[in-house]
Amino acid sequence: MYAVIRTGGKQYKVSQGDVLRVETVAGDAGGEVIFDDVLMVGGDEGLKVGEATEGAKVTGTIIRQMRDKKVIVFKKKRRKNYIRTQGHRQNLTVVRISGIS
């Protein structure tokens, strides 16, 4: 059985036992998280999309909170002595999917 969930403005295809890196979800390591925004559920019984997925939930366990690799933002205007460098590290949560219902 698999499902498509939406979290952090992105969509993920998940099945039981998968490990995902998603945008920050509040909680501590070992805590449980519930994804209510299920877009599609598929399996042996067939495919459910849209209103048929109301009431579907995907549960997972938070493995750890982490930060992604640094992305460097570099701006320059030629001949004007203007250079700006800025770094950004996105906060992520590593989640193991424990069930789809």
UniProtKB/Swiss-Prot annotation:
Bilayer-spanning residue ranges: none
Q: List the disulfide bonds.
A: none
User: Function, please?
Assistant: This protein binds to 23S rRNA in the presence of protein L20.
What InterPro entries does the annotation carry? bL21-like (IPR028909), bL21-like_sf (IPR036164), Ribosomal_bL21 (IPR001787), Ribosomal_bL21_CS (IPR018258)
Tell me the organism: Magnetococcus marinus (strain ATCC BAA-1437 / JCM 17883 / MC-1)
Query: Gene of origin?
Result: rplU
Protein name per Swiss-Prot or TrEMBL? Large ribosomal subunit protein bL21
Recorded hits in Pfam families, A to Z, give: Ribosomal_L21p (PF00829)
Name the domain of life this protein comes from: Bacteria
Instruction: Give the record's GO biological process terms.
Output: translation
Quote the HAMAP family the UniProt record gives. Answer: Ribosomal_bL21
GO MF entries: rRNA binding; structural constituent of ribosome
PANTHER family associated with the record: 50S RIBOSOMAL PROTEIN L21, LARGE RIBOSOMAL SUBUNIT PROTEIN BL21M
Give UniProt keywords alphabetically: Ribonucleoprotein, Ribosomal protein, RNA-binding, rRNA-binding
Keyword Transit peptide listed? The answer is no
Can you tell me which family this protein belongs to?
A: Belongs to the bacterial ribosomal protein bL21 family.
Q: Does the keyword Ubl conjugation apply?
A: no
Q: Which GO terms describe its cellular component?
A: cytoplasm; ribonucleoprotein complex; ribosome
